[in-house]
Structures are given as C-alpha cells and as structure tokens.
C-alpha cells in the first residue's frame, strides 16, 4: 500500500485466510450464550459455476475424500446449483459435530484454491437456528414491521467471504416471499461475535444469500 493510498484513506484488501474458519466452533459457543442459536449441522461453499473436466475432477476428488470419512452420518456431500446460477458444495453433519463440518468446508475451499480455482470461490456458510423462536428485538429489512418470527425457528447463517477474509451474519425471515432479513438480529450477532471472528465492517458487503443450502 502506497503513500497515496494512506492519504486517501484506502485500505489494503484482506488476503484470504481459510484458517479463520476454525474460529467458528468457539464462536458458536458465544452465539448460543448470547442469542440462543445452535448449529444445524449444515454448511456449504459457494463458487461461480465452472464447466470443464479439470474442475469436475477436483470436485469428484473432494466429494470422495469427504464421503470416505468413517464418522460421517447422514446425507453425502453434494453439489447443487441455485436459481441464480451459482454452485454450492453442501455438507451435512450432526448438529453437535460443528468442528467436523468446519473441516469439510476448509477442505473444499483448500482443494479448489490449490487447483487454481480460488478466483471462483465466493463464500462459505454455516447454518444455525433458534428452535425456541425467540422474538427479534427490532424491525426487519423490507418487512415494515416487527422482526418476530411468530414462534417458528429463527435461522441464521455465519457467512465467510473468501476474498475478504471476513465473516458476517445473515438471518432470513420465514414467511412471505422469503426475501426479508432480520437486520436487528444480524447487528446483535455482530456485536456478540466481535471478539471471536473477524467481522466484515462494510455493511454493504453483507450480501443476502437467499436460499443458501445448509442454512
């Protein structure tokens, strides 16, 4: 970063640091204590869809590696494509096995990065829920009213931005057209996890990952 960047207040982009994913298990303990959320056991890695044999080979190797885990229970690792054209590698573990889930996400990111597909990596998402359906304390974005979920489980994703090396919370609200988020809860989670994770400070980068698998 040069002198002109300093004078103009520009900041050097944060390099990807996949090891920050390993901070999620401790953050989950804080999150449960602060807001009542627990892991769902679902998580996923999002990347720009890539066609070609080279990518298919890497994907198959990663899936085979993760599915070979003797301790894995439930659905096998799968590749899905969302309505926006992005691809997601999805892993599902037991809710109590968050460290293993984080290991899966780290392995997927690392394999794609090592094979030259780092530029296609976008984010990783780990799902949480509050089955108690605690009422949110404020209005949600685009809802024009209370962020309460009417007694149903609240959902929350902790999103890791690969190119930023930062995390942010995303909480979609149930009902309606599925395009509302609980902004007040997201801000509450940001404050609660400030000492556990490197939180993305630019709120404009808190992109809504509607329909993210594993969330």
Please place each PLM-identified region on the residue numbering.
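Core of folded catalytic or high-affinity ligand/protein-binding domains
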Residues: 72-131, 156-158
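A glycine-rich, hydrophobic loop/mini-helix early in the fold
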Residues: 33-90, 94
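Compositionally biased, intrinsically disordered low-complexity segments enriched
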Residues: 133-152
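Conserved NTP-handling cores and scaffolds of large molecular machines
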Residues: 11, 66-70, 112
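A short linear-motif detector with a strong N-terminal bias
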Residues: 22-27, 66-69, 101-105
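Terminal interaction module
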Residues: 18, 116-133, 151-215
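Charge-rich, low-complexity segments
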Residues: 1-55, 181-215
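N-terminal start-of-chain detector that recognizes signal peptides
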Residues: 15-20, 59-62, 95-98
């Amino acid at each position: 970063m040069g002198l002109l960047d300093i004078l103009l207040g520009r900041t050097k982009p944060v390099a990807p640091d996949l090891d920050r994913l390993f901070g999620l298990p401790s953050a989950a303990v804080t999150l449960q204590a602060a807001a009542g959320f627990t892991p769902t056991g679902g998580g996923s890695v999002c990347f720009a869809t890539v066609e070609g044999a080279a990518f298919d080979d890497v994907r198959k190797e990663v899936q085979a590696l993760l599915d070979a885990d003797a301790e894995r229970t439930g659905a096998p690792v799968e590749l899905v494509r969302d309505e926006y054209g992005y691809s997601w590698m999805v892993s599902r573990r037991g809710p109590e096995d968050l460290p293993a889930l984080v290991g899966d996400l780290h392995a997927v990111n690392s394999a794609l990065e090592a094979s030259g597909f780092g530029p296609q990596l976008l984010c990783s998402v780990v799902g949480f829920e509050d089955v108690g359906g605690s009422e949110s304390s404020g209005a949600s974005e685009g809802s024009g009213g209370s962020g309460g979920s009417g007694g149903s489980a609240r959902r929350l994703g902790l999103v890791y931005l690969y190119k930023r090396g930062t995390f942010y919370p995303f909480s979609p609200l149930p009902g309606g057209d599925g395009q509302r988020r609980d902004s007040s809860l997201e801000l509450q989670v940001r404050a609660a996890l400030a000492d556990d994770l490197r939180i993305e400070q630019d709120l404009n980068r808190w992109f809504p990952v509607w329909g993210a698998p594993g969330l």
